[in-house]
Amino acid sequence: TDPRLYRALGSVPTSSGETVNTASVLGLAAAWACVNLLAGTIASLPLMVYRTRGGARTAASDHPLYRILHDSPNADQTALDFWEFVCASLELHGNAYAEVVRARNGRIIALGVPITPELVTVRRLETGALEYEWVDQGRRIIAGQDRVLHIRGFGGNPLGGLSTLSAGRQSFGLAQAIERASGDTFRNGVRPSGLLKTADTLTIDQRKQAEELLQEKFAGAINAGRPMLLDRGMDWVQL
Protein backbone atom coordinates (compact mmCIF):
# COMPACT_ATOMS: atom_id res chain seq x y z
CA THR A 1 0.00 0.00 0.00
CA ASP A 2 1.26 3.51 -0.82
CA PRO A 3 2.55 5.11 2.44
CA ARG A 4 1.13 8.44 1.26
CA LEU A 5 -2.37 6.98 1.56
CA TYR A 6 -1.73 6.04 5.19
CA ARG A 7 -0.50 9.55 5.96
CA ALA A 8 -3.56 11.04 4.29
CA LEU A 9 -5.73 8.91 6.56
CA GLY A 10 -3.76 9.96 9.64
CA SER A 11 -2.00 6.62 10.13
CA VAL A 12 1.28 4.90 9.25
CA PRO A 13 2.03 1.19 8.55
CA THR A 14 4.52 -0.81 10.62
CA SER A 15 6.51 -4.03 10.27
CA SER A 16 4.37 -5.59 13.02
CA GLY A 17 1.31 -5.22 10.82
CA GLU A 18 -0.32 -2.77 13.21
CA THR A 19 -1.57 0.59 11.96
CA VAL A 20 -0.38 3.48 14.11
CA ASN A 21 -2.55 6.57 14.48
CA THR A 22 -3.61 8.98 17.21
CA ALA A 23 -6.38 6.76 18.57
CA SER A 24 -4.31 3.57 18.61
CA VAL A 25 -1.33 5.22 20.34
CA LEU A 26 -3.50 6.89 22.98
CA GLY A 27 -4.99 3.44 23.58
CA LEU A 28 -1.63 2.45 25.05
CA ALA A 29 -1.72 3.23 28.76
CA ALA A 30 1.89 4.46 28.90
CA ALA A 31 1.45 6.77 25.91
CA TRP A 32 -1.80 8.17 27.28
CA ALA A 33 -0.21 8.85 30.67
CA CYS A 34 2.77 10.65 29.10
CA VAL A 35 0.72 12.83 26.76
CA ASN A 36 -1.85 13.62 29.43
CA LEU A 37 0.79 14.53 32.02
CA LEU A 38 2.91 16.71 29.73
CA ALA A 39 0.03 18.47 28.00
CA GLY A 40 -1.88 19.06 31.21
CA THR A 41 1.15 20.32 33.13
CA ILE A 42 2.36 22.69 30.42
CA ALA A 43 -1.15 24.02 29.74
CA SER A 44 -1.67 24.77 33.43
CA LEU A 45 1.25 27.23 33.39
CA PRO A 46 -0.02 30.78 32.73
CA LEU A 47 1.07 32.29 29.42
CA MET A 48 1.84 35.92 30.17
CA VAL A 49 2.37 39.06 28.13
CA TYR A 50 4.98 41.41 29.58
CA ARG A 51 5.91 45.03 29.06
CA THR A 52 9.48 46.19 29.62
CA ARG A 53 10.18 49.76 30.66
CA GLY A 54 13.46 51.06 31.97
CA GLY A 55 14.80 47.54 32.36
CA ALA A 56 11.85 46.50 34.55
CA ARG A 57 9.38 43.86 33.36
CA THR A 58 5.72 43.98 34.36
CA ALA A 59 2.67 41.99 33.31
CA ALA A 60 0.85 43.81 30.50
CA SER A 61 -2.66 42.80 31.51
CA ASP A 62 -4.06 45.70 29.50
CA HIS A 63 -2.52 44.46 26.24
CA PRO A 64 -5.09 43.08 23.72
CA LEU A 65 -3.18 39.78 23.42
CA TYR A 66 -3.12 39.20 27.17
CA ARG A 67 -6.77 38.18 27.29
CA ILE A 68 -6.35 35.89 24.27
CA LEU A 69 -3.20 34.11 25.46
CA HIS A 70 -3.80 34.11 29.21
CA ASP A 71 -7.57 33.94 29.67
CA SER A 72 -9.51 32.63 26.68
CA PRO A 73 -8.35 32.40 23.04
CA ASN A 74 -11.90 31.99 21.74
CA ALA A 75 -15.52 31.75 22.83
CA ASP A 76 -15.42 27.95 23.12
CA GLN A 77 -12.25 27.37 25.12
CA THR A 78 -10.39 28.51 28.17
CA ALA A 79 -6.66 29.04 27.87
CA LEU A 80 -6.12 25.68 29.61
CA ASP A 81 -8.29 23.81 27.10
CA PHE A 82 -6.64 25.52 24.14
CA TRP A 83 -3.02 25.02 25.17
CA GLU A 84 -3.63 21.46 26.33
CA PHE A 85 -4.78 20.52 22.82
CA VAL A 86 -1.84 22.43 21.33
CA CYS A 87 0.66 20.60 23.54
CA ALA A 88 -0.90 17.20 22.82
CA SER A 89 -0.72 17.93 19.08
CA LEU A 90 2.97 18.80 19.41
CA GLU A 91 3.73 15.64 21.37
CA LEU A 92 1.95 13.34 18.93
CA HIS A 93 2.32 15.05 15.56
CA GLY A 94 5.18 17.51 15.97
CA ASN A 95 2.93 20.38 14.89
CA ALA A 96 0.10 22.48 16.29
CA TYR A 97 -2.15 24.76 14.26
CA ALA A 98 -4.79 27.36 15.04
CA GLU A 99 -6.43 29.96 12.84
CA VAL A 100 -5.63 33.57 13.70
CA VAL A 101 -8.82 35.64 13.70
CA ARG A 102 -8.31 39.29 12.83
CA ALA A 103 -10.50 42.37 12.77
CA ARG A 104 -10.82 44.45 9.62
CA ASN A 105 -7.96 46.64 10.75
CA GLY A 106 -5.71 43.56 11.07
CA ARG A 107 -5.73 43.43 14.87
CA ILE A 108 -5.78 39.92 16.34
CA ILE A 109 -9.03 39.37 18.22
CA ALA A 110 -9.00 35.58 18.77
CA LEU A 111 -7.36 32.25 18.07
CA GLY A 112 -9.65 29.63 16.60
CA VAL A 113 -10.09 26.15 18.06
CA PRO A 114 -6.85 24.24 17.31
CA ILE A 115 -6.94 22.37 14.00
CA THR A 116 -6.37 18.62 13.99
CA PRO A 117 -2.82 18.26 12.58
CA GLU A 118 -3.71 15.35 10.27
CA LEU A 119 -6.07 17.65 8.37
CA VAL A 120 -3.48 20.32 7.57
CA THR A 121 -1.30 20.50 4.45
CA VAL A 122 1.55 23.02 4.35
CA ARG A 123 3.29 24.09 1.16
CA ARG A 124 5.72 26.80 0.14
CA LEU A 125 4.66 29.15 -2.64
CA GLU A 126 6.92 30.52 -5.36
CA THR A 127 7.01 33.77 -3.41
CA GLY A 128 8.62 31.95 -0.49
CA ALA A 129 5.58 32.35 1.75
CA LEU A 130 3.85 29.39 3.38
CA GLU A 131 0.30 28.40 2.56
CA TYR A 132 -1.95 26.23 4.72
CA GLU A 133 -4.89 24.12 3.62
CA TRP A 134 -7.35 22.14 5.72
CA VAL A 135 -10.97 21.03 5.81
CA ASP A 136 -13.41 22.27 8.45
CA GLN A 137 -16.85 20.63 8.51
CA GLY A 138 -16.64 19.84 4.81
CA ARG A 139 -15.41 23.34 3.93
CA ARG A 140 -11.99 23.64 2.26
CA ILE A 141 -9.92 26.47 3.73
CA ILE A 142 -6.75 27.95 2.27
CA ALA A 143 -4.91 30.54 4.34
CA GLY A 144 -1.62 32.39 4.30
CA GLN A 145 0.85 32.21 7.16
CA ASP A 146 -0.46 35.49 8.59
CA ARG A 147 -3.73 33.70 9.34
CA VAL A 148 -2.32 30.58 10.97
CA LEU A 149 -0.52 30.09 14.27
CA HIS A 150 1.89 27.25 13.53
CA ILE A 151 4.01 25.89 16.38
CA ARG A 152 6.62 23.38 15.24
CA GLY A 153 8.03 20.64 17.41
CA PHE A 154 11.42 18.95 17.42
CA GLY A 155 13.16 18.19 14.12
CA GLY A 156 11.50 18.51 10.78
CA ASN A 157 11.88 21.61 8.61
CA PRO A 158 10.19 25.00 8.09
CA LEU A 159 7.12 23.21 6.73
CA GLY A 160 6.62 21.33 9.97
CA GLY A 161 8.09 19.47 12.91
CA LEU A 162 8.86 15.77 13.07
CA SER A 163 5.83 13.62 13.86
CA THR A 164 6.32 11.45 16.94
CA LEU A 165 3.83 8.92 15.53
CA SER A 166 5.91 8.54 12.37
CA ALA A 167 9.32 8.55 14.07
CA GLY A 168 8.28 5.99 16.69
CA ARG A 169 5.85 3.99 14.56
CA GLN A 170 7.77 0.71 14.90
CA SER A 171 7.87 0.94 18.71
CA PHE A 172 4.22 1.95 18.93
CA GLY A 173 3.24 -0.80 16.48
CA LEU A 174 5.14 -3.42 18.47
CA ALA A 175 3.50 -2.29 21.71
CA GLN A 176 0.08 -2.49 20.07
CA ALA A 177 0.84 -5.96 18.69
CA ILE A 178 1.97 -7.21 22.11
CA GLU A 179 -1.13 -5.78 23.77
CA ARG A 180 -3.38 -7.33 21.12
CA ALA A 181 -1.66 -10.72 21.40
CA SER A 182 -1.95 -10.65 25.19
CA GLY A 183 -5.63 -9.81 24.95
CA ASP A 184 -6.22 -12.65 22.48
CA THR A 185 -4.41 -15.05 24.81
CA PHE A 186 -6.58 -14.10 27.76
CA ARG A 187 -9.73 -14.21 25.66
CA ASN A 188 -9.13 -17.43 23.74
CA GLY A 189 -6.45 -19.26 25.69
CA VAL A 190 -7.16 -22.75 27.08
CA ARG A 191 -5.55 -23.75 30.40
CA PRO A 192 -3.90 -26.20 30.13
CA SER A 193 -3.25 -25.76 26.40
CA GLY A 194 -3.24 -28.99 24.44
CA LEU A 195 -5.26 -31.49 22.44
CA LEU A 196 -8.37 -33.43 23.37
CA LYS A 197 -7.72 -36.97 22.13
CA THR A 198 -10.08 -39.93 21.74
CA ALA A 199 -9.85 -43.34 20.09
CA ASP A 200 -13.46 -43.10 18.89
CA THR A 201 -14.57 -41.34 15.75
CA LEU A 202 -16.73 -38.35 16.64
CA THR A 203 -19.67 -37.20 14.60
CA ILE A 204 -19.94 -33.58 13.50
CA ASP A 205 -22.40 -32.86 16.33
CA GLN A 206 -20.14 -34.51 18.92
CA ARG A 207 -17.13 -32.48 17.75
CA LYS A 208 -19.20 -29.32 17.94
CA GLN A 209 -20.36 -30.16 21.47
CA ALA A 210 -16.79 -30.85 22.56
CA GLU A 211 -15.56 -27.54 21.14
CA GLU A 212 -18.40 -25.62 22.78
CA LEU A 213 -17.64 -27.32 26.12
CA LEU A 214 -13.97 -26.36 25.92
CA GLN A 215 -14.82 -22.77 25.07
CA GLU A 216 -17.43 -22.47 27.80
CA LYS A 217 -15.63 -24.23 30.64
CA PHE A 218 -11.93 -23.83 30.01
CA ALA A 219 -11.25 -20.87 27.67
CA GLY A 220 -10.07 -17.52 28.98
CA ALA A 221 -8.04 -16.34 31.93
CA ILE A 222 -11.01 -16.59 34.29
CA ASN A 223 -11.01 -20.39 33.84
CA ALA A 224 -7.26 -20.84 34.25
CA GLY A 225 -6.47 -23.94 36.33
CA ARG A 226 -10.00 -25.29 36.25
CA PRO A 227 -9.99 -29.12 36.53
CA MET A 228 -11.04 -31.06 33.45
CA LEU A 229 -13.16 -34.22 33.77
CA LEU A 230 -12.96 -36.62 30.81
CA ASP A 231 -14.95 -39.74 29.91
CA ARG A 232 -15.52 -42.14 26.98
CA GLY A 233 -11.84 -42.81 26.59
CA MET A 234 -10.94 -39.18 26.05
CA ASP A 235 -7.44 -38.03 26.91
CA TRP A 236 -5.90 -34.57 27.25
CA VAL A 237 -2.49 -34.18 25.60
CA GLN A 238 -0.49 -31.26 26.97
CA LEU A 239 1.32 -29.14 24.36
Regions found by a protein language model. Give the residues of each.
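Structured, contiguous alpha/beta core segments that scaffold functional sites
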Residues: 1-239
